[in-house]
């Protein structure tokens, strides 16, 4: 079953809570969840959407980055996964504005994230995931020589295939969710 741990909210008037109080509460809750999971008492935790301004965005962009910092992950290999038994979705970039995504992706980042994802599936589900990687541009930038699909994404996929990852792509992001993709466990987008 689902175990719920209450983190007491000690505000006299919860409708007049200051930003500072809310921030302390959110960080306390996330830290408690992290500590419990780090002690192998639980396999993971679920969080609801959090106002990113409460995490001191100068240092931490979101929960994914908060957990990476707590786990001393400095190589940007952490993965945010939205998961259910039928399909998981993973963005390569997290908490980055759309106009910065193209400049934020690179071959090494894609490789790091997908190796982490693959290892996670092997550890948690005892199997190799079938991974679909999406392109960045509409229609995959028509796979033109200067597109991110040709310069960055495809070389990363080819390198991962050499490492024996079960991976396909880049597929067109425009239409990937129109039909049911039962042949994939995970769809990986650039954002």
What label would you give each PLM region?
Residues 1-191:
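Anion-binding alpha/beta catalytic cores of soluble intermediary-metabolism enzymes, centered on
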């Amino acid at each position: 079953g689902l175990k719920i741990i209450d983190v007491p909210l000690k505000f006299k008037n919860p409708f007049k809570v200051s930003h500072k109080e809310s921030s302390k509460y959110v960080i306390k809750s996330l830290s408690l969840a992290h500590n419990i999971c780090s002690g192998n008492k639980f396999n993971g935790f679920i969080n609801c959407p959090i106002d990113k301004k409460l995490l001191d965005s100068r240092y931490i962009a979101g929960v994914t980055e908060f957990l990476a910092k707590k786990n001393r992950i400095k190589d940007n290999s952490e993965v945010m996964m939205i998961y259910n038994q039928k399909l998981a979705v993973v963005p390569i970039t997290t908490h980055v504005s759309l106009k910065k995504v193209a400049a934020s992706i690179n071959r090494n980042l894609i490789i790091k994230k997908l190796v982490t994802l693959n290892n996670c599936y092997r550890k948690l589900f005892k199997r190799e995931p079938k991974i679909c990687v999406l392109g960045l541009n509409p229609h995959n930038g028509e796979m033109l020589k200067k597109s991110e699909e040709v310069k960055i994404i495809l070389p990363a996929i080819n390198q991962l295939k050499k490492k024996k990852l079960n991976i396909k792509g880049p597929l067109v992001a425009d239409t990937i969710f129109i039909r049911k993709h039962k042949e994939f466990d995970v769809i990986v987008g650039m954002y």
